[in-house]
Curated annotation (Swiss-Prot):
Protein name as catalogued: Cysteine and glycine-rich protein 1
A cellular component annotation (GO) from this entry: Z disc
Domain of life, source organism: Eukaryota
SUPFAM superfamilies in the record: Glucocorticoid receptor-like (DNA-binding domain)
Subunit annotation: Interacts with ASCC1; ASCC2 and TRIP4.
N6-acetyllysine: residues carrying this PTM: 84, 112, 131, 137, 161
GO biological process, one term: sarcomere organization
Cell compartment(s), UniProt: Nucleus
CDD domains noted in UniProt: LIM1_CRP1, LIM2_CRP
PROSITE patterns: LIM_DOMAIN_1, LIM_DOMAIN_2
Modification sites for Phosphoserine: 81, 192
Its job: Could play a role in neuronal development.
Amino acid sequence: MPNWGGGKKCGVCQKTVYFAEEVQCEGNSFHKSCFLCMVCKKNLDSTTVAVHGEEIYCKSCYGKKYGPKGYGYGQGAGTLSTDKGESLGIKHEESPGHRPTTNPNASKFAQKIGGSERCPRCSQAVYAAEKVIGAGKSWHKACFRCAKCGKGLESTTLADKDGEIYCKGCYAKNFGPKGFGFGQGAGALVHSE
């Protein structure tokens, strides 16, 4: 059927979305009134949305449905819970056994179908809601720190060496030039033997 109005289809209701009422997320268009968490129906925006495949969630419901399972996960400090989210209508699915991929570019393939990459620091899965990209890899926000001093980094303030990331200060101290006049500040020469 031709799309005479020229608008895109909403990712939730599949009706035409016109420019004045459009919200875009991960290449999909939504009506402002349809841009709601699929579980709790809370209004979403660019800072609160978490995407899994074609589905949109608030970060809380996303964490309950797809985050780590077990005592103490996703609740904040000092709480333990066995709530698996059934009260919110979340049904847990058994995951099928692992099948090795035959795709030579598995990470890009996994991104397109909603899979996840592994954080180089902790080796855990990195989901879109917690992803930071630096040195060509995906990291958890909490793991995106200098390997030497632990200082939080941004993609513009890091230096990488051998797959590890450092703040510019630690990188300069550990891997920068050494010898006469280096690393002492303006006007100072030091002779070390």
